[in-house]
């Protein structure tokens, strides 16, 4: 009897491992929104990590989050490290490329609760009196991340936060222009 149970468990584990192995290795999340501000204003809000608390959806999850800024004040070379509650974890972002007013590319490294690295890009295109902002995140799933993605949809999970962030970016840039 014990031998049969072990064989059944081994078959189940092998089937689960085979299923996880067939999951996509890469993920991509993309959201866009037209923001009621010109590209140079929107670019300035994204390329300066000091302005992220005004619009980033994750900043609101832990008002007591510790933030450290280093490197350039904004643009290429700017760095931002955060450490907070279980909702935000710990990680850092580095702007690896900033092309005013067209784009900002960021290396995003999560340290806690799990280690992961992604590339995030913001693209800005004039659209009437505003700017079409496209926020993209690309990353690679290791075996454990593939297992996680079997039960959680990255596009739905991160996409909802991107939508909140783009709405916050719109509100922050509009408010800044009124001052």
Where do the protein language model's features map onto the residues?
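Hydrophobic ligand-binding cavity/cleft-lining segments
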Residues: 4-72
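Short, surface-exposed coil-to-beta transition loops
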Residues: 28-30, 88-93, 115-121
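Generic structural detector for well-ordered beta-strands
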Residues: 32-36, 81-83, 94, 105-107, ...
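Residue-level recognition of beta-strand microenvironments
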Residues: 38, 98-101
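Extracytoplasmic/secreted envelope proteins and their assembly/folding machinery
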Residues: 39, 43-52, 77, 92, ...
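Extracytoplasmic/periplasmic/luminal assembly and interaction segments
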Residues: 49-99, 146-148
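Short, highly charged C-terminal tails/helix-capping segments
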Residues: 67-68, 170-179
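Beta-strand/loop substructures that line and gate deep hydrophobic ligand-binding cavities in soluble
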Residues: 96-97, 107-163, 169-171
């Amino acid at each position: 009897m014990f031998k049969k149970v072990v064989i059944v468990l081994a078959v189940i584990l092998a089937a689960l491992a085979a299923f996880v192995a067939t999951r996509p290795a890469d993920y991509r999340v993309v959201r866009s929104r037209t923001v009621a501000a010109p590209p140079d204003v929107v670019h300035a809000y994204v390329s300066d990590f000091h302005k992220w608390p005004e619009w980033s959806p994750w900043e609101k999850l832990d008002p007591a989050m510790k933030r450290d800024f280093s490197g350039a004040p904004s643009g290429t070379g700017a760095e931002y490290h955060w450490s907070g509650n279980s909702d935000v974890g710990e990680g850092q972002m580095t702007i690896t490329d900033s092309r005013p007013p067209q784009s900002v590319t960021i290396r995003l490294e999560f340290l806690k609760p799990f280690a992961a690295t992604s590339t995030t890009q913001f693209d800005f295109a004039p659209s009437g009196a505003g700017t079409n902002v496209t926020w993209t995140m690309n990353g690679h799933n290791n075996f454990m991340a593939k297992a996680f993605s079997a039960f959680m949809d990255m596009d739905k999970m991160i996409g909802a936060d991107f939508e909140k962030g783009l709405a916050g970016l719109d509100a922050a840039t509009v408010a800044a222009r009124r001052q």
